[in-house]
């Protein structure tokens, strides 16, 4: 049955459901996000410290050692700072930071409880990314280090005063820039020269923590049925084909987002550690013939208010059923069943990513466990589906990111069948069903008892075949849409509160208190019969309404 939508095309601006900041570019982070970032990556511990609080030199040494992934606990504390005793709780970190060359060893005292100044913080950052020799060559402390920090692009928004104490919030902001900066190495040197080199992408994160990052679009997660490859449970798929295990329950609603994903290999799997999601402009177009058209790199949405053009970027990324695709024609850009999601990643009013999801619904009649052949219920719209469901070496069957077990393929289960441009096929299977009386129908779907369900565009039945007041078992696909309805006889028991008899030719309706305690209004078929209070006479709905308009009766 094809669903008739009276509201034209549905344009849905998807709300951001993830709980992290909106900026996804670069390494600059506000203090609150930087704290979450370092804690998620297990680099710095989560601390309840006010952003305005000052940072001591001992605190800075602890942070430096953790960021440079040095094992401070095993380092020898040789005691050359007179004010840092070997039994001091910060001694290991202080002497390790000095050994790494981030703090100098020239002074007899370290002053662990003194506030770290802004200029000192900049010097520490410069030393951590390998710019110390270059900074000394450019004038030394503080001017040479300030120049080096500016060259490394970590100074924006950071004060450089030699007397002012750096706040905890500014310190975290500086550290977030530092761990994202490319490291500087000495390529060659002689008595009168030093040559430096930068390897793009080689940072503190990659070098010391083996943490990688990728900026791109999340095109799938494990809740989706059809992807470009089989997903493991609790995983996300990026548009570069990278699959990341997602063990954080807070990272939901990522599909369609342009994100920076930080991940690390653990036990042979890339595990998602942290996500920064950008607040993209996202519009979803639901398939309905005549609602919108596509031509000349733009979608044209037609409604009662006229025509609206949604322009695509000339080099927009197009993914059809989870697979990157080139040379797509207009027929694919306008799926008969499914939806098109448009994503404007940089808010320039042109959509950079197009996610096309197209599927067909099928209902299993039987499944042969030995041959692997799936026999479908007959439907005029399923002939092509039957053809490409014939088992072959290119067919992959998945369910919510996992391979389907043969026990999942049973009669009356619903398949959502997806096909990619390369010819591969993916299926999701749904064994969901709901039973109840059809209490009403409208443009959006059917009301079953107290709940409403949309009807799939290529369902097996039409609305004209359904009768209000009848009891059905409805087969649902993975999107909770009705695909088929099977009539069943069912005895309902309840307490009639009132009848209503509309004028004209409308159906008599009964307000019934059900056994669950809810009140449901049921339309009554003209053929229905009800017993009177003595259980003797059988009356039609119209006769009963006239006779018992304000009475209450127990009926079954």
Where are the model-predicted features located?
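Acidic (E/D-rich), amphipathic helical modules within compact regulatory domains
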Residues: 46-51, 55, 66, 72-108, ...
């Amino acid at each position: 049955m094809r669903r008739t939508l009276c509201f034209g095309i549905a344009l849905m601006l998807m709300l951001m459901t993830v709980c992290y900041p909106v900026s996804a570019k670069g390494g600059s982070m506000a203090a609150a996000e930087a704290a979450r970032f370092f804690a998620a990556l297990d680099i710095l511990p989560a601390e309840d410290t006010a952003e305005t609080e000052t940072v001591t030199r001992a605190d800075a040494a602890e942070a430096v050692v953790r960021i440079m992934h040095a094992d401070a606990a095993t380092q020898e504390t040789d005691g050359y700072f007179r004010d840092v005793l070997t039994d001091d709780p910060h001694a290991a970190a202080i002497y390790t930071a000095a050994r790494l060359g981030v703090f100098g060893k020239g002074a007899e005292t370290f002053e662990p409880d003194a506030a770290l100044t802004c200029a000192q913080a900049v010097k520490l950052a410069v030393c951590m990314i390998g710019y110390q020799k270059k900074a000394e060559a450019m004038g030394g402390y503080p001017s040479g280090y300030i120049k080096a920090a500016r060259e490394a692009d970590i100074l924006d928004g950071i004060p450089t005063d030699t007397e002012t104490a750096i706040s905890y919030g500014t310190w975290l902001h500086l550290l977030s820039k530092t761990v994202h900066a490319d490291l500087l190495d000495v390529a060659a040197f002689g008595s009168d020269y030093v040559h430096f080199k930068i390897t793009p992408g080689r940072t503190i994160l990659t070098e010391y923590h083996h943490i990688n990052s990728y900026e791109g679009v999340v095109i799938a997660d494990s809740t989706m049925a059809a992807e470009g490859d089989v997903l493991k449970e609790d995983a996300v798929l990026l548009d570069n084909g990278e699959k990341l295990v997602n063990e954080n329950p807070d990272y939901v609603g990522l599909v369609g987002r342009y994100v920076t994903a930080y991940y690390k290999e653990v036990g042979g799997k890339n595990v998602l550690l942290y996500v920064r999601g950008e607040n993209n402009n996202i519009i979803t177009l639901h398939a309905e013939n005549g609602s919108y058209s596509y031509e000349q790199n733009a979608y044209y949405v037609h409604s009662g208010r006229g025509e609206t053009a949604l322009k695509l970027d000339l080099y927009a990324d197009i993914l059809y059923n989870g697979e990157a695709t080139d040379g797509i024609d207009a027929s694919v850009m306008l799926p008969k069943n499914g939806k098109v999601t448009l994503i404007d990643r940089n808010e320039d009013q042109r959509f950079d990513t197009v996610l096309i999801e197209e599927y067909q619904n099928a209902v299993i009649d039987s499944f042969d466990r030995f041959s692997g052949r799936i026999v479908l219920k007959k439907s005029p719209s399923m002939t092509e589906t039957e053809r490409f469901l014939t088992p072959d070496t290119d067919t992959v069957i998945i369910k919510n990111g996992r391979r389907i077990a043969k026990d999942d393929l049973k009669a009356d289960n619903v398949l959502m069948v997806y096909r990619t441009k390369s010819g591969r096929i993916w299926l999701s299977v749904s064994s969901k069903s709901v039973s109840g009386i059809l209490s009403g129908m409208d443009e959006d779907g059917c009301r079953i008892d107290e709940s409403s369900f949309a009807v799939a565009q290529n369902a097996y039945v039409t609305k004209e075949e359904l009768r209000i007041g009848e009891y059905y078992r409805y087969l649902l696909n993975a999107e909770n849409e009705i695909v088929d309805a099977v009539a069943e006889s069912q005895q309902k028991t309840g307490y009639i509160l009132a009848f209503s008899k509309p004028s004209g030719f409308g159906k008599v309706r009964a307000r019934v208190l059900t056994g669950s305690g809810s009140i449901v209004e049921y339309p009554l078929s003209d053929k229905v019969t009800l017993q009177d209070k003595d259980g003797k006479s059988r009356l039609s709905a119209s006769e009963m309404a006239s006779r018992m308009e304000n009475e209450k009766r127990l009926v079954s």
